[in-house]
Amino acid sequence: MKIAVLPGDGIGPEIVNEAVKVLNALDEKFELEQAPVGGAGYEASGHPLPDATLALAKEADAILFGAVGDWKYDSLERALRPEQAILGLRKHLELFANFRPAICYPQLVDASPLKPELVAGLDILIVRELNGDIYFGQPRGVRAAPDGPFAGAREGFDTMRYSEPEVRRIAHVAFQAARKRAKKLLSVDKSNVLETSQFWRDVMIDVSKEYADVELSHMYVDNAAMQLAKAPKQFDVIVTGNMFGDILSDEASMLTGSIGMLPSASLDQRNKGLYEPSHGSAPDIAGKGIANPLATILSAAMLLRYSLNRAEQADRIERAVKAVLEQGYRTGDIATPGCKQVGTAAMGDAVVAAL
């Protein structure tokens, strides 16, 4: 099994190194091949997604990704910025389903900004459609307004759109995920205002006829954002579009106490996927050895579970992470009084020891 390792920028190389350390500690061997991406890709080839990196990603069985982005690239034209690498990988690999778990570990309940009784036992899975919606809809751009009260003035415009096949395939992924959990699926939209959202809801209802054992409900996105802060444990699996999912998954991540704990998976139709921590490249702490590697280590566990069909090995890593937290090890972002505060490498070593 071949894994493409794309560390990226900022803290990416540090945290990916710890995930690789954990993979190498398992009792089976994987072929790991590394390549530059993001700002590192731009420095190496003049493009954030070099041709050789894309070829490796296509050839591999799965991709372990760190993070991309750095302030020093903000002046580049949009097509050359590091963040375009992840968008390019999603497009070229046809990764359309993003899984973002939001789990509050018992040992970290006090780190959440919400009261312990609201988040104790929290375990949400957000399934976000990645390839459509207003992020990719055409036409888009800046022009002279052709009509309206400010006709002739400069305006920016984007297009929100979804095709039926796009909605159906993410619906099936979400229903199947819900079927493996509590058999409850919440679809989030804005169908009281947006035609695209009403269409989304209609297709979700139609697909639900194939999953009689799963309870489908609906919620407007503004209410969902409020309910995530008010009573988050009411949710189990949430499915939504690209933009709403982008926002809600970041909100849900902070319920857990630290975005440094949260993995994610982006999958294609055949469960080949790209696995990355939910956080960014954090250039302000890069090279200091203090970044939390647990989200990346847990992303490696998701990689084993979904793309390589190694559920037992994934379980081992997840149990090791829980054991390390139980032993009191903490990086700075999740530190509590009386804990054993450690750096990036020491946390990775602790997980390996727990294995």
UniProtKB/Swiss-Prot annotation:
Binding site for NAD(+): G280, S281, A282, P283, D284, I285, A286, G287, K288, G289, I290, A291, N292
Catalytic activity, EC: 1.1.1.85
Principal location: cytoplasm
UniProt cross-references to Pfam families, sorted A to Z: Iso_dh (PF00180)
Catalytic activity as recorded in UniProt: (2R,3S)-3-isopropylmalate + NAD(+) = 4-methyl-2-oxopentanoate + CO2 + NADH
Pathway the protein takes part in: Amino-acid biosynthesis; L-leucine biosynthesis; L-leucine from 3-methyl-2-oxobutanoate: step 3/4
Cellular component GO terms, alphabetical: cytosol
Gene Ontology BP annotations: L-leucine biosynthetic process
Cofactor mode of binding and number, as noted: Binds 1 Mg(2+) or Mn(2+) ion per subunit.
Binding site for substrate: R90, R100, R128, D222
The entry's keywords: Amino-acid biosynthesis, Branched-chain amino acid biosynthesis, Cytoplasm, Leucine biosynthesis, Magnesium, Manganese, Metal-binding, NAD, Oxidoreductase
Record-marked site positions (Important for catalysis): Y135, K190
PANTHER family: 3-ISOPROPYLMALATE DEHYDROGENASE
HAMAP family from the UniProt entry: LeuB_type1 (MF_01033)
Family indicated by similarity: Belongs to the isocitrate and isopropylmalate dehydrogenases family. LeuB type 1 subfamily.
Assembly behavior: Homodimer.
Name of the featured protein: 3-isopropylmalate dehydrogenase
Species of provenance: Burkholderia mallei (strain ATCC 23344)
